[in-house]
Amino acid sequence: MSNPAPPSPTSLHRALGLSDDELDDIRKVLSREPNHLELALYAVMWSEHCSYKSSRLHLRRLPSKAAHVLVGPGEGAGVIDAGDGIGVAIRIESHNHPSAIEPYQGAATGVGGILRDVFSMGARPLAVMDPLFFGELDDARNRWLVEGVVSGISGYGNSVGVPTIGGELTFDQCYGANPLVNVLAVGALPTSRLALGVASGIGNYAVLLGSLTGRDGIGGVSVLASAGFSGEDGAASIDEAKRPSVQVGDPYEEKRLIEACLELLDHGYVVGIQDLGGAGLICATSETAAKGGVGMDVDVTAVPLRELGMQPFEVMTSESQERMLAIITPENLAAVNAVCDKWEVRATVVGHVVEPALMPDGSRVGLLRVREGFDGEVLGEVPASSLADEAPLYDRPRRRPRDLDAILADDPSDDEPVGDPHDDLAGLLVDTAWVSRQYDSQLFLNTVVGPGRDAALLRLAGPGLPPSRRGFAVSTDSNPRWCALDPRNATALTVAEGVANLACVGASAQAIVNCLNFGNPEHPEVMWQLSESIDGMAMACDALSLPVIGGNVSLYNESGGRDIDPTPVVGSLGVVTSLVAPPPGWNWRAGDAVVLVGHREAAGGRAFPLGGSRWATRRGRRGGRLAEFDASRLRATFDFVTGEVAAVCAGEPSDLTAVHDVSGGGLAVALAEMAAATTLGVSVDELEGHGELFAEFPGRFVMATSDAGALVARAQAAGVPVSVLGVVGGTRLRLGTLVDLDVREMADQRASALERALRRD
């Protein structure tokens, strides 16, 4: 075609976030100068958020294949075969930058977007989890962010009818100007309903489903997540400038869209389907066309608009929420319209699938043409694959932080502990129930274990699913304190922590997803952290036979040139083969023996490492070395605990009465949490001081049993270390000679700690 508009000024590409080299790449693809519209399309699709141009080379090192994986990375969500003809879809995403600017809408639309990723696969969304990271609560702005984000998640999730079943809540000064809002969603589908985001069938229609298109979210996450905050006073200095890039959500529209899409898929009316997330319509059209090896003509004048006077680039890149793109045959259009009318969902033909174009060299290329009318002027024409798959990939410089050796050498494990261990323990006990009380975790009545425990557990049941006694479990885990010291080992240990949490509810780990939250990739130290973290994840997943079936990379989490600590979040998915009874939970009983299952001492050079521990951080110590990742001993312990708890879930006779993973805060916190859950105390005599109380490393479980001899014998037969700690009873928590607390007073303090911190005004 002839160039449909004058060439763009040379400065425009920079204003859109494209480099000079990237402009040259675009010229080579097109063999001409791009026009304004085409530059805008490349700017959003080649942004860091959409293209992963700084991380994709490294992500290739992650294992993603296994016999039970139905869909791996690259689609809306990963999907595993959970058995009984049921697939489970899982996805995790970040909405960090939008939430820093507009916490309610940023978090709410994060939930909406992740749900669309899941039901685009044909899965009914069944649950949401939310790992959240904020600055310290002595800052009023951080308290405002916490309340806004939690309200946004609860407002959207409760209204759309999907339970929020858990997550994480972390406070650290590094997130003061750049909070992290990650959202994980899980859904289930009959495997016969599995859908993919592929356009095929020449002459088929591209149908836009859902909300009107407006200017909200123009260049939203694709721009916000591709640059840091520049203000020295944090995000506040640029809030107003970037606020229009934050999308606005409507959960009731989303609910209707879910039901309409699932009914369309049930009837077989849909050839391919994809949500409109980051980069909006241009992302959905270019990606579906590229996957199908076809071209697509899109009529911008056909798109239903909420605002007058929108320009073509605005229509194509708007990130207005609650929209899907479905590829359907002309024969099914009337039936599709009937279903959408039933659910009061707009359905508009905005495009056609077309033959790949014959190029001068004889090759065929699927072109994406943006038109003014289906037979009207071509406003822009680019190869679909060049937008979706061919962004330049950068192997950015990497450098180990120069001060890291000094930080590692400052090891709190070497110190003689000082201070009151009662205060230490009290400062580590925070119940996040204030957050979970705002979420409805029991929607659908399938939640067996909800927020606040090691992992969430749900029955694998829902409308349209085959009957099954199976269940699925989900956990989210992270440890930025560890990752700041040793991102490779720390990420491996975080993967192990996720498997440990699943074991506590009897679930066998099947797959993980990740959300990699890091600072500015243009800083070599940040790229070193990211590369090391990915290698650690690959190491652990290979050792524990876990495929990585999806993920998200969030970069440029910085403010005023200060990067956040590396924060890889691992979402772990497990399956319980027979779920006819709840797992034991934390509810030990008077007279039970309390047993530590797993190696009492850490792998590596230190028996009880305090480096990166919550205990040390609370004392202002952020250095030291971590335990080593030892796959062989971890796997044996995980298999044993999973089997013990799975037997309870299957309704088999068992002496096991309670189980809890030892993680953040160490053994002291695990015992205190179990005591607080029941107001029953325990006395533990033989402990190796502060180190054994507060050291953190995965692979240890506190289990309560009515028959210590039987449990010990089974553990020993499995080759798993085990030691009896004490007996449940009384009203005091006694840990060696260091801790002696009234359980009820401790439980009350723990229950109110977070709300007191939020209400300090």
Residue ranges of model-derived segments:
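Alpha-helical propensity feature that highlights long, continuous alpha-helices across diverse contexts
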Residues: M1-P73, G83
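Glycine-/charge-enriched secondary-structure boundary and capping motifs
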Residues: P4-L16, D20-E22, I26-L39, A177-P179, ...
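Predominant activation on well-ordered alpha-helical scaffold segments within soluble catalytic domains
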Residues: D20-R27, A40-A43, R56, V111-L115, ...
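Non-catalytic terminal/interface segments that mediate subunit docking, oligomerization
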Residues: W46, C50, R56-T109, G113-F119, ...
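Intrinsically disordered, low-complexity boundary segments flanking structured domains
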Residues: L57, P63-A67, S151, L169-D172, ...
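Mobile "lid/hinge" segments at catalytic clefts and subdomain interfaces of large enzymes
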Residues: E75-V345, V349-L358, G362-G366, G464, ...
